[in-house]
């Protein structure tokens, strides 16, 4: 079968966008709507992955559980947010998807939205109660991801929703450390103007300025001094 991702026919139909065939199968056997495959995924997981909004809406109308997790702890919301499925994220949230659910890495849907620069989805999640400072198993937040990836608008969005700039991950790095290390100049400058400390040391006993390359460290030092002087 085209696009065979699952050992369950109903999941393959969901992934391939075969709405009519899916409806026919489920109406003949309602239990198929919630049956799990080799990855502990349901038809809803696979429809979210492939972005088939009509199939997602059909399944949600049937009342399928929205918070079931696959064998890696991914909920349909994780999958839709990571894949950039705006309309599906909206539909899942309306149906009560748990916005702060974590997968086996400790990541929320917001971690993936921030990492993959999904602006509208990040706003929907935050408006829906997502914790902007949620930490994964490495103590990294969405801000760590946005800063490291150079997603400037995402940094702005997270700041608007009061995300902290000085949380340290398991390596002792703040988002500013990561922005400096990856030479994300505009992101680093923005973080410093919004209260990110240039003095916090990571586990290698390095501050963001010591991690910064080229002339970035000097630029950040001047910004920080200017901010301190105006306080």
From Swiss-Prot:
One of its GO terms (molecular function) is RNA polymerase II-specific DNA-binding transcription factor binding. GO terms for biological process: apoptotic process; negative regulation of apoptotic process; negative regulation of DNA damage response, signal transduction by p53 class mediator; negative regulation of MAPK cascade; negative regulation of NF-kappaB transcription factor activity; negative regulation of release of cytochrome c from mitochondria; negative regulation of transcription by RNA polymerase II; positive regulation of cell growth. ANK repeats lie at residues 3-36, 37-69, 70-102, 103-135, 136-168, 169-201, 202-226. Gene3D superfamilies: Ankyrin repeat-containing domain (1.25.40.20). Keywords: ANK repeat, Apoptosis, Chaperone, Cytoplasm, Nucleus, Repeat. GO terms for cellular component: cytoplasm; cytoskeleton; nucleus; proteasome complex; proteasome regulatory particle, base subcomplex. PROSITE patterns: ANK_REP_REGION (PS50297), ANK_REPEAT (PS50088). It comes from the Eukaryota. Its main location: cytoplasm. InterPro entries: Ank_repeat_dom-contain_49, Ankyrin_rpt, Ankyrin_rpt-contain_sf. It is found in: Cytoplasm; Nucleus. The keyword Repeat applies. It holds the Pfam family Ank. The keyword Endoplasmic reticulum does not apply. Part of transient complex containing PSMD10, PSMC4, PSMC5 and PAAF1 formed during the assembly of the 26S proteasome. Stays associated throughout the assembly of the PA700/19S RC and is released upon association with the 20S core. Interacts with PSMC4. Interacts with RB1. Interacts with CDK4. Interacts with MDM2. Interacts with RELA. Associates with a CDK4:CCND2 serine/threonine kinase complex. Interacts with ARHGDIA and increases the interaction between ARHGDIA and RHOA, hence promotes ARHGDIA inactivation of RHOA and ROCK. Acts as a chaperone during the assembly of the 26S proteasome, specifically of the PA700/19S regulatory complex (RC). In the initial step of the base subcomplex assembly is part of an intermediate PSMD10:PSMC4:PSMC5:PAAF1 module which probably assembles with a PSMD5:PSMC2:PSMC1:PSMD2 module. Independently of the proteasome, regulates EGF-induced AKT activation through inhibition of the RHOA/ROCK/PTEN pathway, leading to prolonged AKT activation. Plays an important role in RAS-induced tumorigenesis. PANTHER family: CYCLIN-DEPENDENT KINASE INHIBITOR 2C-RELATED (PTHR24180), PROTEASOME 26S SUBUNIT, NON-ATPASE 10 (PTHR24180:SF39). This is 26S proteasome non-ATPase regulatory subunit 10.
């Amino acid at each position: 079968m085209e696009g065979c991702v699952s050992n369950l026919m109903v999941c393959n139909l969901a992934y391939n966008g075969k709405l009519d065939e899916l409806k026919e199968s489920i109406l003949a056997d309602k239990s198929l709507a919630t049956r799990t495959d080799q990855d502990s995924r349901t038809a809803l997981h696979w429809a979210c992955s492939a972005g088939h909004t009509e199939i997602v809406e059909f399944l949600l109308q049937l009342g399928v559980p929205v918070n079931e997790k696959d064998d890696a702890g991914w909920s349909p919301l994780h999958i839709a947010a990571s894949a950039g499925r705006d309309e599906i994220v909206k539909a899942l949230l309306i149906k009560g998807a748990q916005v702060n659910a974590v997968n086996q890495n400790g990541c929320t849907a917001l971690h993936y939205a921030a990492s993959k620069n999904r602006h509208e989805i990040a706003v929907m999640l935050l408006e829906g109660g997502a914790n902007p400072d949620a930490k994964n198993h490495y103590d990294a937040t969405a801000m760590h991801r946005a800063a490291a990836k150079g997603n400037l608008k995402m940094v702005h969005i997270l700041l608007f929703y009061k995300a902290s700039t000085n949380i340290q991950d398991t390596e002792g790095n703040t988002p500013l450390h990561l922005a400096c290390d990856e030479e994300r100049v505009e992101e680093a400058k923005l973080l410093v103007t919004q209260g990110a400390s240039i003095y916090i040391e990571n586990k290698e006993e390095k501050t963001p300025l010591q991690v910064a390359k080229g002339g970035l460290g000097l630029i950040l030092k001047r910004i920080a001094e200017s901010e301190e002087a105006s306080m």
